A protein has these predicted regions:
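Transmembrane helix boundary and interhelical loop/hinge segments in multi-pass membrane proteins
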Residues: 62-89, 96
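Secretory targeting signals
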Residues: 2-64, 68, 92-164, 203-224, ...
């Protein structure tokens, strides 16, 4: 993810000078590639690339969580684990905790890369960075928390799909297809519903709120999606026949 963050940052800063006005937001998640120099130069502008990275990070983490959860089924290790730890809730919860810790480290690294490359890239493009000093740490902390919460929820959705399908390929296909295709199609036919779908909600959270969905409602809806994913995963894992 850190490598993607660096590449996206380069694209954002090098293309900003050629953008006269911000492009209209596209339906569905993502769509923050085109930004203006003025947007980058404003307070908190050093985190501009993080909004675009978030969509890629969401797909990557959904895939990683899904593979970690589904690989035990494909290898047959799940039977050994369940026999060694009959309390399935504890078993799946432990896996979730380990994946959350990994996600925290990944989002720290990604955020740091975005911040570290922002100043050199801005200087190369002649973008003024004086305003970045205004509330630097509050902007950084807020962006990191929003990004991390969204990343964890994407991971939980990937884990949910893996538990239900028992297949990493199927789980990743469904998750990525929903995020990159289905939500965009819904955005074309029913644009008012887009902000409340998983991708639109998480994108609104990372953006600090939008005109259609404020930060607090986005946070609440994001946490709701996460809670639903955890609940369904635990119930399905607890009740499903694994040993036979």
């Amino acid at each position: 993810m850190a490598g993607f963050a660096a590449l996206v940052s380069v694209f954002i800063y090098t293309s900003a000078s050629a953008v006269a006005t911000p492009a209209a937001p596209q339906p569905g998640p993502g769509g923050r590639f085109a930004v203006t120099v003025a947007q980058i130069a404003e307070p908190g502008g050093f985190l501009t690339a993080l909004g675009t990275v978030s969509t890629l990070a969401g797909v990557i983490l959904l895939a990683l969580w899904a593979m970690c959860a589904a690989s035990d089924y494909s290898t047959g290790v799940i039977r050994i684990l369940v026999q060694a730890e009959p309390k399935r809730i504890r078993l799946l919860t432990g896996k979730m905790v380990a994946l959350v810790v990994f996600t925290l480290l990944a989002t720290v690294a990604t955020t740091l890369i975005v911040v570290l490359v922002s100043h050199p890239l801005a200087r190369l493009q002649g973008i003024e960075t004086q305003a970045w000093k205004t509330d630097f740490f509050p902007h950084l902390l807020s962006a990191y928390v929003n990004f991390t919460v969204a990343a964890i929820v994407w991971g939980l959705i990937g884990l949910l799909l893996a538990v239900l399908t028992r297949s990493s390929a199927l789980a990743i296909g469904i998750g990525a297809g929903w995020l990159l295709v289905v939500e965009n199609l819904i955005g074309i036919t029913a644009p008012d519903a887009t902000p409340y779908l998983p991708g639109g909600t998480l994108n609104a959270l990372i953006s600090g709120g939008t005109s259609k969905l404020g930060w607090l409602p986005a946070l609440g809806l994001t946490l709701l999606y996460g809670a639903v994913a955890v609940s369904i995963s635990l119930v399905a894992f607890h009740r499903r026949d694994i040993l036979s």
